Amino acid sequence: LLIKRGIKKGDKVAILMMNCLEWLPIYFGVLKTGALAVPLNFRYSSDEIEYCVNLAEADVLVFGDAFIGRVEEIAERISKGRLLIYVGEGCPSFADDYNSLSANCSSMPPRIVLSDDDDAAIYFSSGTTGFPKAILHKHRSLVHSCKVEQYHHGQQKDDVFLCIPPLYHTGA
């Protein structure tokens, strides 16, 4: 989906969604393309969304139905040179529909070489003293976090795990 839309290694894809079935495939799909995932706090105001999308220099904003109003408020200002992809039913006119775009995508993994030292994600601080600050993570950092969580919870391959924290948070 993203590669067909011109997204390549080093590009940035902001994700503004509540925890949902599509969240993880989108997040890991972004990482597999070599692009950087930029998860956004679902509590952000329109101004904070605009600030973070611009600061991260996101090439794409993927957003869910809970954010139509907030994204619509800033769509004209942030859409120039940036893809807006909507995940949900009833796609707004200012965005592309995720379901339509993903309907004919290949299930084959992209042939993109990634290393532990490649940039992987940009997370944002809580912004308690002003606008949120961007924090760059390498693939090594994300893999290490996964290993720590797996060890901490003692998860096995076939376990079912209920994730309560928001997925935009590094601790989720």
Task: State the predicted function of each range.
Residues A121, I135-Q156, F161-Y168:
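Conserved structural elements of the adenylate-forming
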Residues L1-Y44, P166:
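Conserved AMP-binding/adenylate-forming
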Residues A56-E57:
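Active-site charged/polar residues at nucleotide-handling catalytic sites that mediate phosphoryl
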Residues I68-D116:
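ANL superfamily adenylate-forming
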Residues D47-E48, R70:
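Short acidic active-site motifs
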Residues A103-F124, F131, G154-V160:
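Conserved pre-ATP/AMP-binding loop-to-beta segment of ANL
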